[in-house]
């Protein structure tokens, strides 16, 4: 999660040049103008983004909807986790923002803010309580009604099919994502969503951050479904195998995703004219030193962070780095599966917050028993002076240059992919006068524009999140919303923060944003 240094609003009008410049020769004046505009600052408005680019904000079903046991919804693996002793904060998503009952007023608030797009997730266990089979009419009614409200408001809809909320019934029946049985069940669930909502939803994302959930849910067991094995798990897992299950989870996620994409293309795309993509978590990584070992470790980390998902989707197989590291523990694609996953996407969604430094830890591969962390054989540093860890650090440092470098890397490595920035924001400021969040969003929106001007094919940007909601890390104490929610009030009162008014001014009034080009990235590297 990114934290941002405080400062004044980045909105301001264009200032006139100093009169003394008029005394310089035309050539020198031109040079000075280039320095001012190209190096020291960047000024832009909403209109500087390409046609078809959309700005929005997001929420997620478990974190927003509440009504956990209402109108036929059954528990998901996230419900089970939230109600267990493994949940360090003890809070649950039983009520959350009560979006299940308050979505109409929330859509009105989105419209007032000027959102052009809204990214939300669908609860599988609300729509199909048993995980397969009969559709819950109440769940269907809820999503149809919310989608209709968004359509009436003229807000582009970006729907996500899965976000850490597998129906618990499927987890109990066959182990969920570690079983190949989940592939057909997910495709059938996706088909219901495409059929019922696809006449109004044109942007579909199958899964959020599987590259992170593999390690957190199936290696160290920290997140749902809390599977791990000794000696790797952080928690006292009773089920799991940290050496192989992260790889099985990703393998079946890719096959489920690709099956849903093929189904959409064969049954729905011609009539609905929508697109389907997958989301990945996308930190950027710098080598800790210029040593050959640290540089190689950084490239290895990128293969695990990005290539684990993108290499199969683009080339039909896992990166050679992963094959060498994991050996027989990494599943093989059959010829049919390789053909199925290759090019099985129309876009890639990126969740981007911060950057890490990386150093080599090749001694990890000498362990008699290895997990994914050992296979990566690297250490992660939030700063050059921090204590390193074996797993990447979400961090609190702002590094918009990292987003630019990530997009540049992905374009060079995997071709001219179409991207949506589906999450970016800050959870560090609970006040209504959240100037720090404005600074954060300003810098990352500017980085997005710079990337586009440098050739990246980015079509949208979503703030995380539209309103405060239940968070996996921090429960209700993390405040990512540009709209504040008073979780202590019975009405769960919403109140736009200063960042919401700033975002609205940018989107509705084409307000000018001025950014000191690179200044925040410079500060990031200075503190490291």
From Swiss-Prot:
Active-site residue numbers: 209 (proton donor), 423 (nucleophile)
Pfam (any one): Glyco_hydro_1
Binding site for a beta-D-glucoside: 63, 163, 353, 423, 464, 480
Signal peptide: 1-41
Residue positions with a glycan: 236, 241, 424, 429
Catalysed reactions listed for this entry: Hydrolysis of terminal, non-reducing beta-D-glucosyl residues with release of beta-D-glucose
Disulfides per UniProt: 228-237
Enzyme Commission no: 3.2.1.21
GO molecular function list: beta-D-fucosidase activity; beta-galactosidase activity; beta-glucosidase activity
One GO-annotated biological process of the protein: carbohydrate metabolic process
Keyword tags: Disulfide bond, Glycoprotein, Glycosidase, Hydrolase, Signal
Domain of life: Eukaryota
Family from the record: Belongs to the glycosyl hydrolase 1 family.
Name of the protein: Beta-glucosidase 19
Source species of the chain: Oryza sativa subsp. japonica
Name of the encoding gene: BGLU19
């Amino acid at each position: 999660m990114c934290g941002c240094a405080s400062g004044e609003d980045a909105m301001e009008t264009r200032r006139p040049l100093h009169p003394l410049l008029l005394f310089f020769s035309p050539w020198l004046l031109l040079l000075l103008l280039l320095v001012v505009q190209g190096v020291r600052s960047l000024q832009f408005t909403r209109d500087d983004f390409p046609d078809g680019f959309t700005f929005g904000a997001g929420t997620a079903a478990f974190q927003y909807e509440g009504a956990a046991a209402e109108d036929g919804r059954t528990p998901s693996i996230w419900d089970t986790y939230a109600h267990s002793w493994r949940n360090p904060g003890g809070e649950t998503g039983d009520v959350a923002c009560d979006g299940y009952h308050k979505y109409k007023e929330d859509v009105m608030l989105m419209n007032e803010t000027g959102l052009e797009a809204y990214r939300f997730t669908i609860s599988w266990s609300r729509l199909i309580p048993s995980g397969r089979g009969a559709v819950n009419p109440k769940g269907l009614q809820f999503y149809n009604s919310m989608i209709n409200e968004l359509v009436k408001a003229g807000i582009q809809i970006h729907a996500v099919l899965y976000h850490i909320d597998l129906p618990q019934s499927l987890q109990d029946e066959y182990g969920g994502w570690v079983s190949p049985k989940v592939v057909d069940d997910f495709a059938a669930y996706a088909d219901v969503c495409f059929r019922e909502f696809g006449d109004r939803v044109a942007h579909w994302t199958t899964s959020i951050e599987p590259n992170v959930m593999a390690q957190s849910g199936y290696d160290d067991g920290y997140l749902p479904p809390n599977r791990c094995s000794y000696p790797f798990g952080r928690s006292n897992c009773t089920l799991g195998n940290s050496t192989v299950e992260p790889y099985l989870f990703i393998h079946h996620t890719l096959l489920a995703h690709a099956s849903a994409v093929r189904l959409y293309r064969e049954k729905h795309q011609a009539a609905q004219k929508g697109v389907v993509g997958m989301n990945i978590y996308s930190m950027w990584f710098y080598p800790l030193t210029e040593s050959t070992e640290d540089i190689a470790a950084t490239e290895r980390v990128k293969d695990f962070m990005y290539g684990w998902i993108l290499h199969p989707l683009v080339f039909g197989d896992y990166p050679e780095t992963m094959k060498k590291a994991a050996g027989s523990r990494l599943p093989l694609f059959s010829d049919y599966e390789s053909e199925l996953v290759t090019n099985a996407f129309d876009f890639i969604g990126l969740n981007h917050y911060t950057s890490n430094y990386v150093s080599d830890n090749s001694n990890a591969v000498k362990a008699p028993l290895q997990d994914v962390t050992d296979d990566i054989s690297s250490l992660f540093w939030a700063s050059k002076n921090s204590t390193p860890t074996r797993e990447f650090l979400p961090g609190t440092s702002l590094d918009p240059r990292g987003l630019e470098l990530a997009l540049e890397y992905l374009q060079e490595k995997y071709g001219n992919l179409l991207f949506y920035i589906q999450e970016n924001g800050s959870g560090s400021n609970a006040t209504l006068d959240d100037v720090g969040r404005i600074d954060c969003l300003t810098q990352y929106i500017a980085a997005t524009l710079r990337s586009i001007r440098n050739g990246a094919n980015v079509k949208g940007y979503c703030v995380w999140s539209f309103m405060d909601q239940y968070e996996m890390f921090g429960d209700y104490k993390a405040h990512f919303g540009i709209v504040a929610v008073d979780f202590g009030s019975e009405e769960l009162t919403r109140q736009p923060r200063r960042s919401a008014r700033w975002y609205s001014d940018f989107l509705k009034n084409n307000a000018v944003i001025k950014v000191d080009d690179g200044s925040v990235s410079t500060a990031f590297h200075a503190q490291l």
